[in-house]
Design a protein with these regions (language model features):
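Intrinsically disordered, low-complexity
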Residues: 1-61, 158-167
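Aromatic- and glycine-rich peptidoglycan recognition patches
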Residues: 88, 95, 102-107, 122, ...
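Residue-level signature of the cytosolic catalytic core of signaling kinases
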Residues: 43-46, 71, 123, 156
Length: 167
């Protein structure tokens, strides 16, 4: 909790993104969106391990620079944590760093467990956001809070960059 307190006092070192320093409470925390992953997708052992870890944190708030359950997560911190605790060893990557680890995959070839990448979600060069593709145009990502979301929404379509497959 002390690390979270520091993030709140410093606004995650991004006051342009976090204009207030208040702890969330039940009345201000957004509720996550849930999704039932098709059972056939979970027959893939790597994807099942990824989802076993990833779903533990649904509802956690977005924290700029966060990379563990004790600090909560930002998008790349969340994906890095999930991968490092489900069979990969990628260290702490940025969204661009995660993209660089992947082989690009076409929309026709994307499958559950691939990563999905976006540009222009905030002012930074290169890939700026990432999530885990879970099938049926749905991703699990660290929005605010960690939640499932539909990739067919206008926002995600406007910022979509690529799907990527981990080695």
């Amino acid at each position: 909790l002390s690390a979270y307190s520091l993030y709140m006092r410093t606004l995650g070192n991004r006051p342009d993104l976090f204009g207030q320093a208040q702890y969330p409470n039940a009345s201000t925390i957004k509720q996550p969106t849930y999704y039932d992953i098709p059972p056939e997708a979970l027959k893939d052992d790597r994807f099942a391990a990824m989802m076993e870890e990833a779903t533990k944190y649904i509802g956690y708030p977005y924290v700029w620079g966060g990379s563990s359950p004790s600090t909560s997560f930002d998008c790349s911190g969340y994906i890095s944590w999930v991968l490092n605790h489900s069979g990969w060893n990628v260290g702490r990557q940025t969204a661009q760093g995660l993209y660089n680890l992947c082989t690009p995959v076409s929309t026709a070839q994307v499958k559950p467990g691939d990563l999905v990448f976006f540009k222009g979600t905030y002012d930074t060069p290169g890939v700026s956001h990432c999530g885990i593709y879970v099938g049926n145009s749905i991703m699990l990502h660290c929005g605010d809070p960690i939640s499932y979301t539909n990739l067919n929404s206008k926002y995600w379509q406007e910022h979509f960059y690529s799907y990527g497959r981990l080695p």
